[in-house]
Amino acid sequence: ALELLHDVSQTPNAHMITRLRLDAELWNPAPQRKPHQNGRPRVKGARRPSPKQRLDDPNTLWTTLEVEHWYGHEKRNVAIYTATCVWYKSGFQPVLIRWVLVRDPQGQYDPQTFLSTHVDHTPEQILTWFVQRWRMEVTFEETRAHLGMETQRQWSDLAIARTTPVLLGLFSLVALMANDLIP
C-alpha cells in the first residue's frame, strides 16, 4: 500500500483517498539537513501519536462535520480530527499524507481513519470523495449480485472486456425505460 501511495503522490495531478489503519505509525516530516552534515539523510522526524492513540486521548480536539450520504443516511454529523504527517514503514519510501479520524457521536459506527496523498485537501473533501467511492462500490456489488457481472464464463479476454460494459449499458437502458413507464 505504501509503495502505491508513494507512486501516486509523485504523479502530478493524481491523488489517492483511502482508509488508514488505526494503528498506523505516523511521523513528523524529516528535519532540514544542516549544511555539510555527515551521515545518511533522515527520512522521518519524531514519532506522532497513532489515530488509535488520538481516539483514546481525552485532550483530542474534535470538530463536528456534517457529511452527506454517510452510509445511506441523507446527512450525518460526525466528529473528526485531522492532521498532516509522514506515513513511514521500514523498507518503503515515506509518504506525506493528510489523515482524518472519524468518530460517530451516536456510537452506531466504528471509528475510521481516512487519508489523502494531497495534504491540501480539506477533511470535507476527503470524506465526500470517500463516500462517493463507497457508493460506486455498492453499485458494483449490486450488479454482481443482481446481474451476475464478473461471473460470465468466457475464454477470451476480449469477450470478458465486452460483456461487463454491455451488461451495465443494458441495465441502465432498462432502468431508464422503467422510469418512463412507471409514473
Regions found by a protein language model. Name each.
Residues 1-183:
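Single, function-defining residue in the core of a domain
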